[in-house]
A protein has these predicted regions:
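Short loop/turn motifs that connect adjacent beta-strands in outer-membrane beta-barrel proteins
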Residues: 29, 45-53, 95-105, 119, ...
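Surface-exposed strand-loop-strand hairpins of Gram-negative outer-membrane beta-barrel proteins
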Residues: 29-34, 62-86, 120-126
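Transmembrane beta-barrel strands of outer-membrane/channel proteins
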Residues: 33-36, 56-64, 106-114, 150-158, ...
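Residues on the lipid-exposed face of transmembrane beta-strands in outer-membrane beta-barrel proteins
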Residues: 46, 58, 88-93, 134-140, ...
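Outer membrane beta-barrel transmembrane domains
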Residues: 61, 69, 75-76, 208-324
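Residues that define the transmembrane beta-barrel architecture of outer-membrane proteins
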Residues: 81-89, 126-132, 170-176, 210-218, ...
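Long, hydrophobic/aromatic-enriched structural stretches that serve as scaffold segments
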Residues: 82-138
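Detector for outer-membrane/organellar transmembrane beta-barrel domains
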Residues: 149-257
Length: 324
């Protein structure tokens, strides 16, 4: 079975946005999603651990926003400044079990986040562990230049949540939902085109009786390999759409902007786009540098994300330890 891409390339960006989106705003409760929207990038379906192998990924993310938009895409909060710095570690395992024409895998990722927020003259800061991302089952398949996967994801409650705090790291609700992706590598990895689709069902925050609306993501990218060493340059992005209304105590949430206009549902929308470059590390590792810019934003912060993501086979640590 041919795998034209290093296993790192797809999973490397599969979690970073969960830490970068653990940030306050408008859409959904506190405006934040528990889900890693937009994080899927290079070879989302082609990049998985080999059978019986484990990969380790480390994510460093810095998010900067000086604007928070209302439902009309206008600035909603004066003197708004948001800074998020996050580190996340992820272990991804291919169990080597074949079923339904594919291979079975799973992964878990834990983000640690530092947030700083100033708005309308008030300032807040918080550190802690955000929502943990757990995928108990993912099924993927490689045939020629077509790679696909299906998976079921879950997000746990953020462990350090405090109802009385104006700023929290992560969300106090769990969530779950299916995802599907496809990667095309028509010239043995020289060209890569990816798409991923997620549908997220949010559970109720029992501390506030707030239920965020369900969310849909379409994540996409296209890249080209330019050197024999495997350096890849491309673009990626995502379309985010909250498809159902926010509700609190069973009633649809109503918001009012600075001009006195009311909107119902508190739904968020955004388009994200930017460049990225992948540098190979050995045969099965890589580092990704990425910049994403928020556009057409409604009921969410509008800013920029800067990422450094590194992934290597977990066995590399064992070999390094034995060599000492």
């Amino acid at each position: 079975m041919r795998r034209p891409l290093p296993p790192i390339l797809g999973s490397l960006v599969s979690f970073c946005l969960i830490v970068c989106l653990a940030r306050p705003a408008l859409a959904t409760e506190n405006g934040a999603s528990v889900w890693p929207v937009g994080a899927e990038g290079f070879a989302t379906a082609a990049g998985v651990p080999e059978a019986g192998k484990t990969m380790y990924y480390n994510y460093t993310c810095f998010y900067l926003a000086n604007r928070m938009n209302d439902a009309q895409g206008k600035s909603a909060t004066p003197q708004f400044h948001l800074r998020v710095f996050a580190e996340a570690g992820k272990f991804s395992r291919n169990w080597g079990v074949k079923m339904l024409g594919g291979e079975l895998g799973s992964y878990v990722a834990v983000p640690v986040v530092h947030e700083q927020l100033s708005a309308a003259g008030a300032q807040f800061s918080r550190d802690g562990v955000s929502n943990v991302n757990v995928v108990p089952a993912t099924l993927f398949n490689h045939k020629g230049f077509v790679h696909w996967y299906f998976e079921f994801e879950m997000e746990t409650l953020a462990p350090g949540y405090q109802k009385a705090d104006a700023l929290n790291v992560g969300q106090h609700n769990s969530a779950m939902g299916p995802a599907a992706g496809i990667s095309l590598t028509p010239r043995k990895g020289a060209e890569i085109v990816d798409s991923r689709f997620d549908y997220i069902v949010n559970r109720t925050d029992r501390a506030t009786e707030y239920r965020s609306g369900n969310e849909f993501f379409w994540q996409f990218d296209a890249q080209q390999k330019f050197t024999r060493r495997g350096i890849t340059v491309g673009t990626s992005g995502y379309l985010y759409d909250q498809v159902t209304d926010d509700k609190q105590f069973g009633t649809t949430v109503v918001t009012t902007n600075a001009g006195g206009m009311q909107t119902t549902g508190n739904r968020g929308r955004s388009l994200d786009f930017g460049p990225q470059i992948t540098l190979p590390i050995g045969k099965h590792g890589a580092a990704i540098l990425k910049w994403d810019h928020d556009m057409l934003v409604q009921n969410k912060p509008q800013g920029n994300s800067f990422w450094l993501q590194i992934g290597v086979p977990f066995g590399l640590f064992h070999r390094s330890a034995k060599g000492q």
